[in-house]
């Protein structure tokens, strides 16, 4: 059994449901300590984190990842027990194989190989690992990033092991992510008997035209790296459940996934301009859950795409699609270049999550060449 697979099996066999770690990080730090990494355990609240670094020079290349996994749901629906870490038909099965314990194992074996091949490599190698990525993400990477900023630890390049591939390993990497803005809109009408609409003011009717305008608005057209900003309605709720009452209020939950062509403040302002045209009373509260970030083509992107070309002989597509990730904290707090590169995302968060054993070995090889491209 090769080193990557052995490490992956050891990690996957631990039921580290978010925000629990249950010893995954000890496996990692034990491995790294033998490679002369300085380990700093950082526990915030109930969340386990660690920072590890080898070297004292720049550039500083950091691998960021998480040891927590999402719940398995109904375990009876799994064909193979989610924490048995079984291999079948060339696939390693289990919760977290793709998201993202396979990446952790691949980077550990790549680091081991790189340090042995280049013991006097330039720069420094760091690891930023948390058990709070799949949950609230309040005591994990964001706290570690703030700690690193406080101690003046520079991070030049950060590779995040999130599963980025869509059809084959290496076909897509993420060089940024869109921002996320949520709005909770309350449209205020007047409750009344449904047979006497002239004595009431139906907030659902008031909402329809305004929401249609919001849905049809062109917020921006995106740019070279980002698709156009997306506006979606996720929830609409109104009424008491009976058939003869016009409701007094209607609640609507909105979401923007926005590009660098807009700021969240600009989007908030434009929403209010549109709502104000409709002359009804409303209240709106906002929750900004993530800024957009972008790593343009440059040293880190080139190191990743060239490594993929070397190992897989394919041309990689850059993407900023998908949800938010911990990469945003590292990009925004530490001002680092950030790229997400990991295995296929086809089975993540699903029953029977799995990853190809060959892909794990190839991913380790890709990570090795990224290290080589940055630090030699």
Curated annotation (Swiss-Prot):
GO biological process: diaminopimelate biosynthetic process; L-arginine biosynthetic process; lysine biosynthetic process via diaminopimelate
Known cofactor(s): Zn(2+); Co(2+)
Gene3D superfamilies per record: 3.30.70.360, Zn peptidases
EC number in record: 3.5.1.18
UniProt entry tagged with the keyword Transmembrane: no
Catalytic activity field: N-succinyl-(2S,6S)-2,6-diaminopimelate + H2O = (2S,6S)-2,6-diaminopimelate + succinate
One Gene Ontology term of the molecular function aspect: succinyl-diaminopimelate desuccinylase activity
Catalytic residue list: 68, 133 (proton acceptor)
Tree of life domain: Bacteria
Residues annotated for Zn(2+) 2 binding in this entry: 99, 134, 349
CDD domains for the chain: M20_DapE_proteobac
Pathway listed: Amino-acid biosynthesis; L-lysine biosynthesis via DAP pathway; LL-2,6-diaminopimelate from (S)-tetrahydrodipicolinate (succinylase route): step 3/3
Keywords: Amino-acid biosynthesis, Cobalt, Diaminopimelate biosynthesis, Hydrolase, Lysine biosynthesis, Metal-binding, Zinc
Enzyme class: hydrolase
The record's free-text note on cofactor binding: Binds 2 Zn(2+) or Co(2+) ions per subunit.
Residues where Zn(2+) 1 binds: 66, 99, 162
Record Pfam families: M20_dimer, Peptidase_M20
Similarity comment: family membership: Belongs to the peptidase M20A family. DapE subfamily.
Function: Catalyzes the hydrolysis of N-succinyl-L,L-diaminopimelic acid (SDAP), forming succinate and LL-2,6-diaminopimelate (DAP), an intermediate involved in the bacterial biosynthesis of lysine and meso-diaminopimelic acid, an essential component of bacterial cell walls.
Quaternary structure annotation from Swiss-Prot or TrEMBL: Homodimer.
This protein's name: Succinyl-diaminopimelate desuccinylase
Source species of the chain: Ruthia magnifica subsp. Calyptogena magnifica
Gene it is expressed from: dapE
